[in-house]
């Protein structure tokens, strides 16, 4: 009884302090938030930040998330003890985890926009974000183990730094968006310079069990400038500019990249089955359109027996245009000789097949003239092929190219894009070459 009274008094005190804090002018509130920053440049080596890629790591992340959401009222308890959403099945979603002494103690998921969209766009206006260009990802499914919630950001700050590093270096993402509880939004605004979206408040956010939510966005391209201005003159430990932009955190395990792919699919067929058919019945909740899209992503035979049944189309694999499991972004140079003059164009290759590719060019490209294209497919993987720009696409600056005879490096790359299932397969591309 006594403990109950004490805990109730503490809650009342916290509520009163929050109310008093809210009456302060916003610049003062933001300054107070920033004064609490304390970033450890050399965390305990037992802390490891990595992509959750094994069944065990993902299950630990989903369990931590479930328990955190239940305790906060963001979901009702699930019999599985896990919070797993359809978005976690997609190759465009990456789950990051923080492990301490081998145990998952923090997690967040990055849901990049795909044919499934992402949760937030159903209720918030993203028109201003889209107008700036660049890919968008939703930061979702954030949870920290109770044992580390009062440690001054010992898990949260490294996890957020990992998110920033991953999005800007590997995930080809310019904007991140969030939907957070109104009580938390000022922390994101003051420390990371999130800006509220149009019509930013939603009283009942279905993705969080009807809890209120505020939508906000962060332009990662602009973040260094904001952080430098806000934390100018601060010591390294008190500066998020130093922490996010200048510091290399030794605890972060960066993903390997043989090729310049921009996502990290981890869902092997058996893992899809385990999380969405066995531990949960997630696939049972999909409508026909969502099932068709799932088939269009996982069109390989080894996935077929695990995908949802009851699909009404006679051939589910043809119900939607086949979607890529891998995304990539490779630089290239296209050179032609025309009337004795050499012309060279800088390209960014974003889609490809065995005998062609789609690329963006900064300047207009002369079409219907054969030349040579050199594409940097990876840090140590270069393809040099005779090519022809066949025409400009409707989208500004995009051109289709035809290849005369793809070389070995190009064939390895395309074969793995078509037949691979996870990021690990990209590191073993030779085995996907046809006999």
Language model region names:
Residues 116-118, 130-138:
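A conserved beta-turn-beta hairpin within the catalytic core of GNAT-like acetyltransferases
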Residues 2-12, 57, 79-84, 96-98, ...:
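Structured alpha-helical
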Residues 9-55:
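Conserved N-terminal entry element of GNAT/NAT acetyltransferase domains
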Residues 150-165:
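Conserved acetyl-CoA-binding loop-helix of GNAT-fold acetyltransferases
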Residues 167-179:
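Conserved GNAT acetyl-CoA-binding A-motif
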Residues 206-218:
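Phosphate-/nucleic-acid-contacting segments
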Residues 140-151:
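A short, internal acetyl-CoA/4′-phosphopantetheine-binding micro-motif in the GNAT/acyltransferase core
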């Amino acid at each position: 009884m006594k403990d109950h009274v004490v805990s109730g008094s503490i809650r009342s005190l916290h509520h009163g302090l929050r109310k008093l804090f809210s009456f302060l002018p916003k610049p003062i509130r933001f300054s107070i938030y920033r004064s609490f920053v304390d970033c450890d440049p050399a965390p305990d080596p037992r802390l490891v930040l990595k992509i959750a890629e094994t069944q065990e790591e993902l299950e630990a992340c989903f369990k931590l998330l479930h328990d955190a959401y239940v305790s906060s009222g963001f979901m009702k308890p699930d019999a599985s003890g896990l919070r797993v959403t359809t978005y976690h099945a997609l190759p465009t979603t990456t789950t990051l985890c923080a492990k301490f002494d081998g145990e998952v103690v923090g997690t967040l998921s990055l849901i990049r926009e795909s044919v499934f969209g992402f949760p937030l766009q159903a209720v918030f206006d993203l028109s201003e974000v889209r107008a700036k260009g660049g890919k968008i990802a939703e930061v979702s499914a954030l949870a920290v183990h109770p044992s580390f919630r009062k440690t001054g950001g010992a898990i949260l700050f490294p996890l957020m730094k990992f998110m920033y590093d991953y999005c800007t270096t590997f995930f080809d993402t310019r904007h991140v968006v969030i939907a957070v509880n109104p009580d938390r939004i000022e922390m994101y605004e003051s420390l990371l310079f999130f800006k509220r979206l149009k019509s930013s408040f939603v009283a009942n956010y279905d993705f969080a069990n009807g809890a209120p939510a505020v939508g906000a966005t962060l332009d990662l391209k602009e973040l260094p400038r904001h952080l430098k201005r806000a934390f100018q003159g601060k010591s390294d430990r008190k500066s998020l500019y130093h922490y996010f932009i200048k510091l290399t955190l030794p605890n972060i395990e960066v993903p390997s990249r043989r090729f310049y792919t921009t996502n990290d699919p981890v869902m092997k067929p058996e893992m899809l089955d385990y999380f969405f058919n066995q531990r949960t019945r997630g696939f049972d909740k999909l409508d026909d359109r969502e099932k068709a899209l799932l088939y269009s992503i996982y069109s390989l035979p080894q996935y077929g027996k695990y995908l949802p049944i009851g699909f009404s189309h006679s051939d589910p694999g043809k119900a939607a245009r086949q979607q890529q499991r891998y995304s990539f972004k490779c630089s290239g140079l296209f050179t032609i000789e025309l009337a004795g003059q050499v012309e060279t164009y800088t390209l960014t290759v974003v889609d490809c097949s065995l005998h062609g590719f789609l690329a963006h060019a900064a300047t207009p490209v002369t079409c219907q003239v054969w030349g040579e294209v050199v594409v940097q497919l990876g840090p140590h993987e270069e393809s040099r092929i005779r090519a022809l720009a066949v025409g400009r696409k409707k989208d500004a600056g995009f051109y289709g190219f035809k290849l005369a005879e793809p070389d070995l490096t190009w064939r390895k790359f395309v074969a793995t894009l078509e037949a691979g299932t996870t990021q690990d397969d990209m590191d073993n591309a030779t085995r996907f070459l046809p006999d």
